[in-house]
């Protein structure tokens, strides 16, 4: 996708805002059928600069630490990007040291079970190898590439407007805490692939979302069901072009973003990074805008309190 295609793809967002520029800052109840922002939980964002492990721990620390999200005895599901058999330098997968730090913090918080999960698009064991290696011999059994339908359970999506049912990983449905840990990368169909787009890696048949639905609204339907308690965006490197597979232009950011709001996390990532050679506003990404309108979170990061730290 080139810059012109990105703008065309996201034109609806620009038209929406042009029609009511102030709507981004007013309670969303002024727009028919849209929940007011006051009905959405308070959104917090932490941005840490540093290496993968230290920045991950520091970013979560800005939100009160992992114990604010994981309680003793909790079952935790962590969803990084593990779809490709590529090195961290490609920025197509979540940096394994980010994932390792999340696992360590969850163990420190007293989690009774931790699962690191994905449904890779390519050969499963090759895709998850770098993550398993990073976790070490005692934690490798936490990492699973679930490609068999037996690991999934059919569920309905009560708040789905278009995408109303799917098969979700049983481990996710059993989890007390869901942590999304995407790498920041571009995407040929949705502009970017971050925490919301990444939820597609927790269902069995995501191809139907591509083939049978308008993808951006379908993503929001799925996210109305799968709502991460904590989002960690790996912005150590960002794949700013030719995602999600690469190879493309990789930008070194040495940053990790943490938030309790998947919309805010994705919006902050879009705002911070260059995509396709230029800058975009979160509202120009359809699924971010739609999520904001439907009350799943906030894209108006300029109105949120963002904490920063050097790790």
Residue ranges and their predicted role:
Residues 1-311:
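N-terminal and secondary-structure boundary signal
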